[in-house]
């Protein structure tokens, strides 16, 4: 009986790990130890989607510090300024925070992509 419980526990743990690896959304990515946090730099180049009762959701293409293209989706409590540059702290599809930055403060590899 103890062997069966141990095997069942190992199979359950393996199922949870496989689920974290193959199913990506903002909740699973937040806790997945295999996904690393990175800064993604974006420019507000289009309108966001207004949500009820308030706030705006943005889905934008941006670039990480090495210049790799990434898509991020995040929420803002208000509509953001057009053409503003943001640094988004993302871990997969999970966005922890965002902040407005100056163009000069972004890495050179990102500046060349967002001109």
UniProtKB/Swiss-Prot annotation:
Signal peptide range equals 1-29
SUPFAM superfamilies, alphabetized = BC4932-like
Q: Matching Gene3D superfamilies, A to Z?
A: 2.40.50.480
Pfam families in the cross-refs? DUF1093 (PF06486)
Keyword flag Signal: yes
Q: Which residues form a coiled coil?
A: none
Q: Which UniProt keywords apply?
A: Signal
Induction annotation:
Transcriptionally regulated by YxdJ. Induced by the antibacterial protein LL-37, probably via YxdJ.
Record keyword Signal present = yes
Q: Check the record and name the PANTHER family matching this protein.
A: HYPOTHETICAL CYTOSOLIC PROTEIN, YXEA FAMILY PROTEIN
By what name is this protein known? Uncharacterized protein YxeA
This protein's species is: Bacillus subtilis (strain 168)
Underlying gene: yxeA
């Amino acid at each position: 009986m103890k062997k069966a419980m141990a095997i069942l526990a190992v199979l359950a743990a393996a199922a949870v790990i496989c689920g974290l690896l193959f199913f990506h959304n903002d909740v699973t990515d937040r806790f997945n130890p295999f996904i690393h946090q990175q800064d993604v730099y974006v420019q507000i180049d289009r309108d966001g989607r207004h949500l009820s009762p308030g706030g705006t959701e943005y889905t934008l293409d941006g670039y990480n510090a090495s210049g790799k293209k990434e898509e991020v989706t995040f929420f803002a409590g208000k509509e953001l300024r057009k053409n503003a540059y943001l640094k988004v702290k993302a871990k997969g599809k999970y966005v922890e925070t965002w902040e407005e930055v100056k163009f000069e403060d972004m890495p050179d590899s990102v500046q060349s992509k967002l001109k």
